Amino acid sequence: RGSXLTHLPLRNISD
């Protein structure tokens, strides 16, 4: 988390 993608509902992307 913190990839920047934390604003997305895709929490599957931990990194």
UniProtKB/Swiss-Prot annotation:
It is an enzyme of class 3 (hydrolase). Expressed in chorionic epithelium (trophectoderm). Keywords: Aspartyl protease, Glycoprotein, Hydrolase, Protease, Secreted. GO terms for cellular component: extracellular region. GO terms for molecular function: aspartic-type endopeptidase activity. Its EC number is 3.4.23.-. One of its GO terms (biological process) is proteolysis. It is found in: Secreted, Extracellular space. N-glycosylated. Belongs to the peptidase A1 family. This is Pregnancy-associated glycoprotein 62. It comes from Bubalus bubalis. The lineage of its organism: Eukaryota, Metazoa, Chordata, Craniata, Vertebrata.
